[in-house]
Design a protein with these regions (language model features):
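Bacterial Sec-dependent N-terminal signal peptides
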Residues: 1-24
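Hydrophobic small-molecule pocket/channel-lining residues, especially in calycin-type beta-barrels
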Residues: 22-192
Length: 192
């Protein structure tokens, strides 16, 4: 434990001295103000908090764009964590003949002014990571990301759109490229 504490303190000392060296023109109060703004949840975090609760989900997945979708139903439990800074969603639903559990962690980075989403589930060992911006006109968060496709043996690009329809209804859509065209791979409707 003592060794871990020493390593952590050494890291903080290095990171802090590096940060201070880059900002020699700022006094400590100015730097603290910037850090406080960075760490304080704001309007985008309040928007994420509207997802908190238990949701019923109906998922449609297209394995082939010319075929009928596979439909499944499940539940999602959503909560804000770490002082209202992050949205954690745990989804449970059947997919491809097995019970699936997936976790989504959504953040809004005050510094970069962008959303970040991380998805993991028991259907693989990889992590899907995407970043996005809020589109005021469509009231949607539009993400672009990468995930590993084990069949292709490489990362593939995807786009997803998350939109609150009302306080008790939201929709998530995921798109991929197929023969040079954007096609819908998944649509999930959430209600509570």
């Amino acid at each position: 434990m003592k060794k871990v504490l020493i390593i952590a303190l050494a890291f903080l000392a290095f990171a802090g001295s590096n940060s201070f060296a880059q900002n020699e023109g700022m006094n400590m109060d100015q730097q603290m103000k910037i850090w406080m703004e960075y760490m304080t949840p704001g309007p985008m975090h309040e928007m994420m908090a509207k997802h908190v609760g238990t949701w019923k989900m109906v998922s449609r997945m297209w394995m082939d764009p010319n075929a009928e979708p596979q439909v499944s139903e499940g539940t999602v439990d959503a909560e804000m964590i770490l002082g209202g800074r992050y949205l954690k969603m745990v989804a449970k639903f059947p997919a491809m003949g097995m019970q699936t559990e997936g976790w989504s962690l959504e953040a809004f980075d005050n510094g970069k002014k962008e959303f970040i989403n991380i998805w993991i589930d028991n259907m693989g060992t990889g992590v899907a990571i995407s970043t996005g911006k809020y589109d005021e006109a469509t009231k949607s968060i539009i993400y672009h990301g990468k995930m590993y496709d084990p069949v292709a043996g490489k990362d593939t690009d995807y786009k997803s759109v998350s939109r609150m329809i009302s306080d008790n209804e939201m929709i998530f859509e995921m798109f991929s490229n197929y023969d040079g065209k954007e096609i819908k791979m998944m649509e999930i409707n959430y209600t509570r």
